[in-house]
Amino acid sequence: MARRRKGRPINGVILLDKPTGISSNDALQKVKRIYFAEKAGHTGALDPLATGMLPICLGEATKFSQFLLDSDKRYRVIAKLGERTNTSDSDGEVVETRPVDVTLEKLEACIEKFRGESDQVPSMFSALKYQGKPLYEYARKGIEVPRESRKITVYEIILHRFEGDEVEMEVHCSKGTYIRTIVDDLGEMLGCGAHVTMLRRTAVAKYPYEKMVTLEQLNELLEQAHREEIAPRELLDPLLMPMDTAVEDLPEVNLIPELADMVQHGQPVQVLGAPEQGFLRLTMGEEHLFIGVGEMNDDGKIAPKRLVVFRDEE
């Protein structure tokens, strides 16, 4: 006897405005329950302190979350000068206090040094894993473990405000960039120490800021549906972005139904005019129905990599 599935096969991406004080996984589980979704996954964790854009993939969209993990991000951050903490943010304990003797000219010169490509060593208080455990589990026990530096790129870093011991900046960066580490490094450059007091992610890939929704808004829609005695999906589902928005930057290859059927059965196909390499966004027919992601193989054919499984709600 087939096991009954828990949740419904809803597909799409919800742009959650994560509140401060909860983990990204807690936020994910709340959204999953609200949507009664069968599957859900986020696309790059935010610290509990942080707020802002947390794209949550539902259903088949989870197959394409890696492409959002790899995308550029934008942040707004406020740093407090003069205090260094063990987590590089205000959730941690102050481990060092130093006087702040910083001029605007010195601050601008130090900030400019972060622009471009560099090597960054991740914080011990991060979710990266070492021997199967998150680094923060070691850090909480006072254990320091080796971490490899990673190539990151800061495309843009803008100073918006410098008042007293507070610095407010905007950062546009590549995947895997730790803003806490940038702030900690900035504090050391300035000779006074620093830590993050506010962090807000304002953009992931090309998703529009104005499409974000809060947990409160989702819960209000849920309550409204119960009051009006309608299915919650009627109010909740229109908020979802199409799942192919996760891969909208990939070149599109539109397949005729016969070739699409071959791809959906795992067979590589030859398509005239297709790019010579890389991942491809595969669509089918005149409606350009998204069916998944393929990759050019060594034979010059499109091989299926991640395919959408279409299922109706029961």
Swiss-Prot record:
Species annotation: Vibrio parahaemolyticus serotype O3:K6 (strain RIMD 2210633)
The record's listing under InterPro entries reads: PsdUridine_synth_cat_dom_sf, PsdUridine_synth_N, PUA-like_sf, PUA_sf, tRNA_psdUridine_synth_TruB, tRNA_sdUridine_synth_fam1_C, TruB_C
Q: Which UniProt keywords apply?
A: Isomerase, tRNA processing
Name used for this protein in its record: tRNA pseudouridine synthase B
Gene Ontology terms, MF aspect: RNA binding; tRNA pseudouridine(55) synthase activity
Looking up CDD domains in the UniProt record yields: PseudoU_synth_EcTruB, PUA_TruB_bacterial
The protein's annotated catalytic reaction(s) are: uridine(55) in tRNA = pseudouridine(55) in tRNA
Please cite one Gene Ontology biological process associated with this protein: mRNA pseudouridine synthesis
Family (UniProt): Belongs to the pseudouridine synthase TruB family. Type 1 subfamily.
Active-site positions, per UniProt?
47
Does Coiled coil count among this protein's keywords? no
Gene symbol here is truB
Query: What does this gene product do?
Result: Responsible for synthesis of pseudouridine from uracil-55 in the psi GC loop of transfer RNAs.
**HAMAP family registered for this protein in UniProt:** TruB_bact (MF_01080)
The answer, when asked if tRNA processing is one of the entry's keywords, is: yes
Q: Which domain of life is it from?
A: Bacteria
Q: List the disulfide bonds.
A: none
Enzyme Commission code(s) on record: 5.4.99.25
